[in-house]
Each structure stands twice: as structure tokens, then as C-alpha cells.
Amino acid sequence: MKRIGLLTSGGDCQALNATMRGVVKGLSHNIDDLEVYGFMNGYKGLIYGDYRMLTAKDFSGILTRGGTILGTSRQPFKLMRTPDANGLDKVEAMKQNYHKLNLDCLVILGGNGTQKTANLLREEGLNIIHLPKTIDNDIWGTDMTFGFYSAVNIATDAIDCIHTTASSHNRVFIVEVMGHKVGWLTLYAGIASGADVILIPEIPYDIDKVVEAIERRKRNGSGFTILAVAEGAISKEDAQLPKKELKKKMEADSKIYPSVSYKVAKEIEDRTGMEIRVTVPGHTQRGGSPCPYDRVLSTRLGSAAAKLILNDEYGYMVGLINGKTKKVPLEECAGKLKMVTPDAQEIRDAKRIGISFGD
């Protein structure tokens, strides 16, 4: 007999349903007596006791369905120890609801903030398994997160579509890709779509170098240029500012520009006189069905999580390392970001074929 809880937290993405399906199938095909409880809308459901028992029917036909059948919400880790508006101790409430159902394990699907809370619950004595979800691919301890390649596909398609109109009108186009702190999504979508300039948070850009790349293409007979810009891209000047000054600068910029891409566009226009167009795919990058790669990855991660549960092994994240599913102790990975390093192989390969990173 196993009694488990499932919870999806943070921003939604593709393959959340597919991953939960992998967990449940991995258990139901190996034990006869299984109870599964789904906590609704992320940690809110665990805090306030909003849950329901799930059956095999709930997991039928969801391999290809985007979003999450459980709903999700954001519960910042830094506020987890702070009582709610009614004075409720959220951590104690989560523990009580876990024990109320007499769970053997709680399987938590989410990104970095979700993972930190998962580790907190582990420290509080609960049996926890975390599965790494994010389109940013920025979770330390795994080569790949589910949702990433689906988002790469969507962002790449968006840039591909811009290519045709950019070439027809001989214009400079900026496509803004999701990623506030890390640039994996922009990097991969930029390379996959043949972007000429890629700007990511980890490599502060020099706008003059960006303009130089555009002018070089014009001299070589290319009348259009495509820039893939992460929403967290930052200039070299801004990157050197102290945190408080940078925050003020960003607040001031936000009153002038809808996002960083519009700022980059204005800076290019001021230096070249060119007309720049900006396209923002936005939340479409998180939506839709998971791509085949993510369906396979999520099934493998879910199956590996089921194996840990069957063996009564808890306190781990299940990651993918060198093509193999691995268990990673939560205390080793919680709170760590996997950043793009300036000397990453992907960066070196991209530069070798002429892609500019504005540095």
C-alpha cells in the first residue's frame, strides 16, 4: 500500500501532466494498492487542505495536454515562514495536512522557488521527491528540465516567422524570449532559428557591439538582422551598478520602455537611424502541448520518481545527467541556479559561426 500526494507549483509549463502521469503509472503498474491525492493550485492546496483523491481516469489522455490538471500558483519561498493574513502558520499547516492524509510521500513538481520550499518540508521531516519543471532550464543538478524543449520549439517558431517578414522588408527585428535571470531558452532558440545577435543576462551587452554586428551584415549584403533578446538581458553599464542603483535604474526604464527589447531597439535606432521592430511571444512559450522530447523526458523522470517511492527513498530531486535519470539530494541542489557561463560550449560554437552576443 502506498499513499502519495501530488502538487504542481509556480508558473505552468508543458509536460506537468505528462510527468504526473509517469509517476502514477510507474507506481500503479508495480503495486496493487495505491492512493493518490492531488493538492489543488500549488502550495495553497497543501496549506489550506484543498485536495481531492485522483483515480486512473484523471491520468488518462493527459500525456499530450499542456498546463496542469491540479492548477498552480506562486507562493514565494521567502514568505513561507510568514503567517498568512489570518495568522496561520503555513509550514505547520502543510505538515498537518500531509499527516492528516497519512501520506507516504509528497511529489512536488516545480522550479527553483518550489524546490526551496520542497527542501524546507524535507527539513521538517516530510518524505519529499522533487521533479524539475521550468522552461528556463536553470535548475542545478539536472542537464534538462521538462518544459524547456517545448518552449524552445515555440520561441524558435516565432523567430522563424519573423525571419520571412524581416527579409522581405530588409528590417531589423528583435524577438524577446522569456528568461529573467538565465539565458538558456534564448540561447537555444536563437541558435535554432539562425538569429544574428543573441543577448542573454549572463553576458552583459555593449550596444555599440550590437550595432557593429548589424552594420557588418549590411556591408556583407544582408539587409535584415534578427536579434533574440532575453527579457533579462542587461547592458554592461547597468551590470556594473550596485544593486540599489540598478533597481532604481530599472524602475526608471520601465516607465519609458515596456521591456528591455524596446530599450535595445531605441538605442539601435538612435545610433543608426534604422526602424526597429519588436515582437514578444510572451506566455505562448509556456503554453500548448509538450513536444515529443519533453513527453519522453517527463515519462522517464516520473518513472524514476516512482522507483524511489517503491524503494522508500526520499529527499531527492530526480534529474537527467548524461542521458541517465539520477537522484540528487535536495539539500545539494535547492536554491542553486544553473547559469549559462560565457565560455559554455554552446556560446563558443555560436560565436564561431558569427553570432554576436554583444560582448
Predicted features along the sequence, with ranges:
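Short glycine-rich or small-residue beta-strand-to-loop segments that form or flank ligand, phosphate
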Residues: 3-11, 69-71, 104-108, 173-176
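C-terminal non-catalytic interaction/assembly regions of soluble proteins
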Residues: 256-359
